[in-house]
């Protein structure tokens, strides 16, 4: 039995806001790049129906955490109107910064959904899991999909894209930006929506993030981090922030630029990947291989 599972992060290589729905969700076009850097989740199935979440320091985490919500949603779907047969003790080793634009919470939720779907012997198909994921957050379907991808709609219409191997230097400002707040600021700033374009066109032009100027305007810390990185490379925002990144053809170049940064600038270097390590690990589980998201 496997107990330890990867929960990878992501970057938005470009991000355009193309409209807004009546329910407040925004239409977007983005290129999701999976990265090796990510959290680790240990999951132990129990037979008492309880869902408990602990950090690596063994602190019990609040009940509203997206991991707990994901597990309870799966319970409700698999055992409606009756006591769940299984529960889980979940231990989270969190290294992806919160409110960073690296997708940590969404990735955590996707990992829990996929692993418990197997270990609780629910065996829901990918379409059902994607539906459940979207109920938790707009980025969760991408992590369930498990491939670097072009996304439209509210992020739930996904087309696989092979992204050439790159290394990424990611700067981590000491601020958190919630996705909800970022989109609120977009509306308050009265920004015009970007025109809807084809994937081919977007992949052929310079990449851009519609939130970049807004976030720099309202966060002095992020603006400073942008200035630091922009001296040596093309700096870009991921998601609604707060993290900033630059891409490099080699690991050596990424480390070279990192060495130029001031000591007070927190940063990490990671490699872009096209297939989620979670999906690769689940593929090794015979019972799960028939419903993994590679079709």
From Swiss-Prot:
Record field: catalytic activity: 4-CDP-2-C-methyl-D-erythritol + ATP = 4-CDP-2-C-methyl-D-erythritol 2-phosphate + ADP + H(+)
Positions of ATP binding: 97-107
UniProt similarity note: Belongs to the GHMP kinase family. IspE subfamily.
Record keywords: ATP-binding, Isoprene biosynthesis, Kinase, Nucleotide-binding, Transferase
Record-given protein name: 4-diphosphocytidyl-2-C-methyl-D-erythritol kinase
GO annotation, biological process: isopentenyl diphosphate biosynthetic process, methylerythritol 4-phosphate pathway; terpenoid biosynthetic process
Pathway(s) per entry: Isoprenoid biosynthesis; isopentenyl diphosphate biosynthesis via DXP pathway; isopentenyl diphosphate from 1-deoxy-D-xylulose 5-phosphate: step 3/6
GO molecular function terms noted in the UniProt entry: 4-(cytidine 5'-diphospho)-2-C-methyl-D-erythritol kinase activity; ATP binding
The encoding gene: ispE
Coiled coil: none
Function summary: Catalyzes the phosphorylation of the position 2 hydroxy group of 4-diphosphocytidyl-2C-methyl-D-erythritol.
Subunit structure, as described in the record: Homodimer.
Residues forming the catalytic site: 10, 139
InterPro entries assigned: GHMP_kinase_C_dom (IPR013750), GHMP_kinase_C_sf (IPR036554), GHMP_kinase_N_dom (IPR006204), IspE (IPR004424), Ribosomal_Su5_D2-typ_SF (IPR020568), Ribsml_uS5_D2-typ_fold_subgr (IPR014721)
Documented EC number(s): 2.7.1.148
Pfam families in UniProt: GHMP_kinases_C (PF08544), GHMP_kinases_N (PF00288)
């Amino acid at each position: 039995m496997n107990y330890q599972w990867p929960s990878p992060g992501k970057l938005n290589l470009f991000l355009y806001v193309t409209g807004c729905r009546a329910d407040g969700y925004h239409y977007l076009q983005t290129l999701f790049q999976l990265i090796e850097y990510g959290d680790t989740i240990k999951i132990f199935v129990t037979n008492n129906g309880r869902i408990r979440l602990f950090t690596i320091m063994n602190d019990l985490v609040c009940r509203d955490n997206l991991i707990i919500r994901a597990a309870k949603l799966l319970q409700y779907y698999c055992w409606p109107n009756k006591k769940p047969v299984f529960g889980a003790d979940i231990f989270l080793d969190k290294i992806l910064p919160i409110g960073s634009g690296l997708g940590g919470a969404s990735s955590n939720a996707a990992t829990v959904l996929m692993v418990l779907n197997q270990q609780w012997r629910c065996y829901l198909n990918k379409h059902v899991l994607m539906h459940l994921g979207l109920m938790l957050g707009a980025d969760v379907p991408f992590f369930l999909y498990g491939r670097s991808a072009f996304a439209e709609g509210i992020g739930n219409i996904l087309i696989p894209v092979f992204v050439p191997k790159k290394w990424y230097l990611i700067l981590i400002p000491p601020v958190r930006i919630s996705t909800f707040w970022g989109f609120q600021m977009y509306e308050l700033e009265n920004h015009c929506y970007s025109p809807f374009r084809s994937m081919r066109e977007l992949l052929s032009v310079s990449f851009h993030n519609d939130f970049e100027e807004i976030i720099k305007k309202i966060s002095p810390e992020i603006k400073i981090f942008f200035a630091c990185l922009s001296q040596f490379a093309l700096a870009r925002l991921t998601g609604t922030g707060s993290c900033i990144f630059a891409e490099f053809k080699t690991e050596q170049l990424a480390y070279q630029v990192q060495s130029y940064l001031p000591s007070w600038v927190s940063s990490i270097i990671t490699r872009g990947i096209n297939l989620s390590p979670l999906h690769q690990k689940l593929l090794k589980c015979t019972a799960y291989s028939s419903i993994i998201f590679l079709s």
